[in-house]
Amino acid sequence: MNQPNSLYLALLIEAKWQNPEDFHFSSDFAKHWLLEQGSLSRRLARHCQHLTVELMRNEKSGMGQLTRQETQGLSPEICLIREVVLSGDQTPWVLGRTLIPETTLADQPYDLATLGDIPLGLTVFSAEQVERDALQVAWIETPQGRLLARRSRLWMNHKPMLVAELFLPDAPIYSRESV
């Protein structure tokens, strides 16, 4: 993992999450991106010719390696940790970190542990039963300035996973704003 991605990931993990009703959105444009209920991957794909995934980490880990914030809303068990960078036309747009409990991996129509360079959102939102709840948002201070982030719990066929996403400096969410 390169140094900027390591820094971004550390900042994402330690984000000070807020409920949307308590958050100061910089614009309605950013608010719509952050509160997106559907697949972020699909939304990003509409803004480029080629959406690609760089898989940085895809391994199981015990709950002891997760922060207290991360374990809220998930059962205390081993999780698959999937960390990726989503890029549009070779420009990094979103750093994502997903925690998928072992019980969520079991009995699914898709093998979430072997997605590789397939966007998670395209797979999850292809399932019959998908819901998003516990959506929170944050500003994250970086050496390049303030960046927006969100996290939520996705339910795929009634089984949870926690998804956190940091919108990198060149992401389309900033195309109509100055942060």
Swiss-Prot record:
Enzyme class label: lyase
Keyword presence, Cytoplasm: yes
Localisation per UniProt entry: Cytoplasm
Broad class of the protein's primary localization: cytoplasm
SUPFAM superfamilies from the UniProt entry: Chorismate lyase-like
Alphabetical list of InterPro entries matching this protein: Chorismate--pyruvate_lyase, Chorismate_lyase_/UTRA_dom_sf
Binding site for substrate: 82, 120, 165
Listed pathway(s): Cofactor biosynthesis; ubiquinone biosynthesis
Gene Ontology biological-process entries: pyruvate biosynthetic process; ubiquinone biosynthetic process
GO molecular function term, any single one: chorismate lyase activity
Catalytic activity annotation: chorismate = 4-hydroxybenzoate + pyruvate
Keywords assigned by UniProt, alphabetized: Cytoplasm, Lyase, Pyruvate, Ubiquinone biosynthesis
An example Gene Ontology CC term for this record: cytosol
Taxonomy, superkingdom: Bacteria
EC number(s) per entry: 4.1.3.40
Record-stated family: Belongs to the UbiC family.
UniProt xrefs under HAMAP family: UbiC
Purpose: Removes the pyruvyl group from chorismate, with concomitant aromatization of the ring, to provide 4-hydroxybenzoate (4HB) for the ubiquinone pathway.
Name of the protein described by the UniProt record: Probable chorismate pyruvate-lyase
Organism: Vibrio vulnificus (strain CMCP6)
